Amino acid sequence: MNKETVQKHYKEQINRVIDHIYSHLDQPLDLKILSAQVDLSPYHFHRIFSAEMGEPLAKFVTRRRLERAASLLLSAPDVPIMNIAYDCGFNSIHVFCRNFKRHFGMTAEAYRNKNQQPNSKNSPFKSITDTTDRLYSRYFCSRKTIITGGKTMNCTFEIKNLPPQPIIYCRHQGALDQMQEAFAKLMQWAYPRGLVTVPGMKLLSVYHDNPDVTEKGRLTADAGMTVNETVKTEGEIGQYELSGGLYAVGRFEIGMEEFPNAWHAMFDLVAEHGCQCTNGHHYEIYQNNRDEHPEKKWVVDICIPVKYN
């Protein structure tokens, strides 16, 4: 294999391992287990992972667990810190507390108190439910007007079960408003294979990090495309299945600058309706082509995995 082919192969292997890490943060993730995912020796995989990602594998796993815990501290303020630590793969609360303070410079409790999410009682967000809607069951759909900073956003909000959804993706690392290159690579790969013109195909972004927690340069997100069946991928193009289950789904009609507020509003609505975030994929799926919208806005579904309190 030439150098370019080798690099593509390594990229594919690393992405497969990262996909496994993201889906199994609550389980053992040592070097031996992870290198076995791609049939490489622990020593060899450790070298190529560190070179590609800029940090050793063990440090990457610990950081991901800590940042996942930090997100849960904010989005699930009533969940005990011990429960969050165990859910994120720490088998000792003392190890979790020591690592958390080393990474964030404060205790988990202080971090939770300092960084109030919008769903706290001091929230700048306010939601107004359309009273013409009826609640038929614990699975409901309601129209909402979100008020923040003197501006309003309309959305429909629903708690519902979503089926698993296979996707192909191109991974992006860095600022979340710079994902155009990843989408361009995805489309360039998918178009000649006839995947772009499949009826019902949707584009989406899957977010693996919370921008309020993870530094901008390490943010990871996937530019994705729905597919109906398993596709043979290669190099930077990978595939996995979006987790099914109970989701909070909010449909917004918004401009690019309104996406952060829409996400914060969704977390506010999740808490308002007696739910909390849980493990699973957080993503937005695009329902239109913004270039065809008269105001150049996106019609987007924001999907957050949840469970009832």
Residue map of PLM features:
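Short, flexible active-site loop motifs that bind/organize anionic cofactors or intermediates
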Residues: H24, S35, L74, Y86, ...
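A solvent-exposed interaction/effector surface
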Residues: I48, K59, E67, L74-S75, ...
